[in-house]
Amino acid sequence: MIRLQNARVPIEGCAVLPAKPNPDARGCLYEIYRAEWPGSFSTVQWNACVSKAGVVRGVHVHVDYTEYYTLLSGRGLLGVHDIRRTSATFGQSVTIDWRAEDRSAVVIPPGVAHALWFVEDAILAFGLSQYWRAEFDAVGCRWDDPALGFEIPDGVKNLSRRDSESGSYQEMVRSYERFVSGDNDTASEMAAAATSIAAA
């Protein structure tokens, strides 16, 4: 496990963008995103995610958009795992101890599976390079699949129905590879899964 502060995420395409805090007697102002920063990208949608301690979000992998994560409060463990066969870091994993005081953002490209375990109550803000669509957010696997190689914290896990019912790591990899190859049947399966997500 590594600390995010001043760290490099050893997965191809995953960038850490440190913010520069500007503290004064009132508190602190710091920029969380600038399109001109090295490793940054254009975003079209921003979301805020409020999570309680013990919540797990993931494991998810996106097929057509990049995410920009920044932790505004609290602490979490971020696990990332590369499932892109053409990547120099294919099959590699890292678990990151991420704290709001690190004042850093993490870029997660398509094909990198990821999950967040919230050790404390936390607020996560994240930007997307394309608008979110449920049918393109249905690829994932169980958070505790040993093939991921994540260092999983102890404690009660609170998951969505979707995440608790996710399949295996191998199923996730097959779905991802079929989708990026243009398999129309997989797209239909994902659309059906999206309906289940919306109903959950």
Language-model segments: which ranges?
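Non-catalytic, conserved peripheral segments adjacent to functional cores
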Residues: 1-101, 131-200
